[in-house]
Amino acid sequence: MATQEAGKLEWRISVDNGTTERLVPRSGLSKRIFLWLKDLVMKVIMERVAKFMRKAWRIGADDPAKVVHCLKVGLALSLVSIFYYMRPLYDGVGGNAMWAIMTVVVVFESNVGATFCKCVNRVVATILAGSLGIAVHWVATQSGKAEVFVIGCSVFLFAFAATYSRFVPSFKARFDYGAMIFILTFSLVSVGGYRVDKLVELAQQRVSTIAIGTSICIIITVFFCPIWAGSQLHRLIERNLEKLADSLDGCVAEYFKENEVSTNRNEDENTNMKLQGFKCVLNSKGTEEAMPLIRFSGFSFSQANLARWEPAHGSFNFRHPWKLYVKIGAAMRRCAYCLENLSICINYETEAPDQVKNHFGEACMKLSSASSKILRELADMMKNTRKSSKMDFLVFDMNSAVQELQETLKNVPIETNKPEEVPSEEENKVDSEERTTSMSLHEVLPVATLVSLLIENAARIQTAVEAVDELANLADFEQDSKKKTGDNNTKQPPLSS
């Protein structure tokens, strides 16, 4: 039965209970394919969104400082935008409140040092370039028809000088961003002043908006959950010293351990992580010195340079010797290169005879233990910012272990006992004595390489000790007043002549 309802024709059928049901036509093949594709696309999109949200949550959970930085940026922008919303404040800066917002976006960084660096560079460069631009504009207006020539020559000369200064390493390390802002501001003021009547008033308004933006950034980054670049660098040095000690102990212990199959998977993973600890020290060079830690507009600043911009905080004074952290990091990386070669010795295809391993094992383990104790003591000095009262004894123990290992190296066994199998009892009775065979060079070479690397690593650790001692003296670390007890107290370090 067909009925017409609201201009549409529909078909109904009668069922057993006396009612009718509407017949719905089956969807075509193209429509079913469209619905299937729609569901597939929505499923893929939802999976991607869920994956992105999980990744974003994991990043924030691993490093809450990133979340804090985002909140601080939002707070700074909210405060500076008041100058744009409120008419009295907006008129007070001559309608240029947007420059304050742009300043916050550009200069706000993840730690105090980077924010201070960019704020000071931006303010000083803007004031200096604006003043020079106004002076050049005045000179150009007094020159009559040569106005365009004067402006063009001044732009060329100042742009050349500022750009060339960015290639000077000492200048680039601290004022690279300021040089770029100087070029930009000077060009805008000097060239733009050719078509602007109230140039001085415009320059004053721009400077005031930049001052407002940088002031808000400095206040928020210092007084609201501050993240100090100096503290981050200090903790990085401390952690790397601990990782070097663990890696040194792990490499030597792994080489001299007996060949046993371990059944504890978690223990193997933990041991492998300690063995690879030296890689963290090698990769941290970018954070300490050379590789870009914070990038903006193509520029990079090292962690030590950023720390120099920060005010006094915690146990760090205003003129804290941050340059020495780069020196300490370089000394640690030299130790890490030795450990990298030590880890290669573990994977040598040529196995040294057990007799040779037993000959060197005790002396190598003793030197490894003495060296790792020094590294851990250095880490403890950095952690507590205190001078060590037992460092001289630990260095004396390490030097004694080096001498002992060198003496052991002079008495390398050149022959090894190898009993030969005999085919018959008669031959066994005739020749029952063990025969000696000489060892080849490639059998002794792995252990000799290990020994030389341990001795070289001890010398490099001595360099790290000197660098940390220099830092402790210049930074006025407190003297360790705790009375040290143990076996080391009975020993006396060698007297210096």
Curated annotation (Swiss-Prot):
UniProt KW keywords: Ion channel, Ion transport, Membrane, Transmembrane, Transmembrane helix, Transport
Residue stretches spanning the membrane: 66-86, 88-108, 123-143, 148-168, 173-193, 210-230
Cell location: Membrane
Membrane in keyword set: yes
Coiled coil ranges: none
Disulfide pairings: none
InterPro entries per the UniProt record, alphabetical: ALMT
Family: Belongs to the aromatic acid exporter (TC 2.A.85) family.
Name of the protein described by the UniProt record: Aluminum-activated malate transporter 10
Source species of the chain: Arabidopsis thaliana (Mouse-ear cress)
